[in-house]
């Protein structure tokens, strides 16, 4: 079963943060990791198997391309995000800012990445789902608290018809 490695990495009920790269891959069928992202969003999060969290930084980032394409292009993306009952869109608050500042100071994350990861820490997710190679090494000392699951590590993944 192609999804087996993903199912082993993310246990039933574990809360997961979806990074911007996951959402972009989900929305863009031409992305190499689209089949994995689609499985994570449609089969794990949308089903309720794994509640998902998305930072407002990621929301902002995934709205840029649709806004550039057409004036109302982002409404489809917003509608999708708002229609997901098991997906929490998390605003940046003082705890997220504090966690992000720590990540910037100690692991030298970029400000956007620090805010995204900080959202995951503040909301106590078990896994950060991303396609960012650097996150695993930067967060290596935090594996007891949080793990990094990279989409690319689960390729090849068959596309759905």
Model-derived segments and spans:
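Short beta-strand scaffold positions
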Residues: 18, 53-54, 91, 111, ...
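Short acidic, glycine/proline-enriched helix-loop-strand junctions
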Residues: 77-99, 104-112, 135-161
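Alpha-helix capping/helix-boundary segments
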Residues: 22-23, 58, 96, 115-116, ...
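Short, well-structured N-terminal submotif of metal-dependent ribonuclease cores
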Residues: 1-54, 68-76, 151-161
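Histidine/lysine/aspartate-rich catalytic loop segments that bind and position anionic ligands
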Residues: 58, 67, 84
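Acidic, PIN/NYN-like endoribonuclease modules and their adjacent C-terminal/linker elements
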Residues: 1-13, 117, 122-161
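Short active-site oxyanion
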Residues: 48-52, 86-88, 124-127
């Amino acid at each position: 079963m192609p999804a087996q490695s993903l199912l082993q990495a993310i246990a039933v009920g574990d809360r997961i943060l979806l990074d911007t790269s996951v959402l972009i891959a989900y929305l863009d069928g031409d992305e190499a990791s689209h089949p994995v992202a689609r499985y994570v969003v449609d089969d794990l999060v949308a089903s309720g198997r794994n509640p998902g969290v998305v930072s407002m930084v990621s929301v902002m980032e995934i709205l840029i391309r649709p806004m550039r394409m057409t004036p109302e292009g982002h409404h489809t993306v917003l509608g999708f995000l708002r229609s997901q009952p098991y997906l929490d869109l998390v605003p940046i608050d003082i705890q997220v800012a504090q966690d992000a500042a720590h990540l910037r100071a100690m692991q030298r994350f970029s400000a956007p990445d620090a805010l995204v990861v900080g959202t995951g820490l503040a909301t106590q997710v078990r896994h950060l789902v991303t396609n960012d190679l650097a996150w695993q090494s930067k967060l290596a000392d935090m594996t007891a608290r949080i793990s990094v699951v990279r989409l690319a590590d689960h390729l090849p993944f068959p596309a759905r018809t």
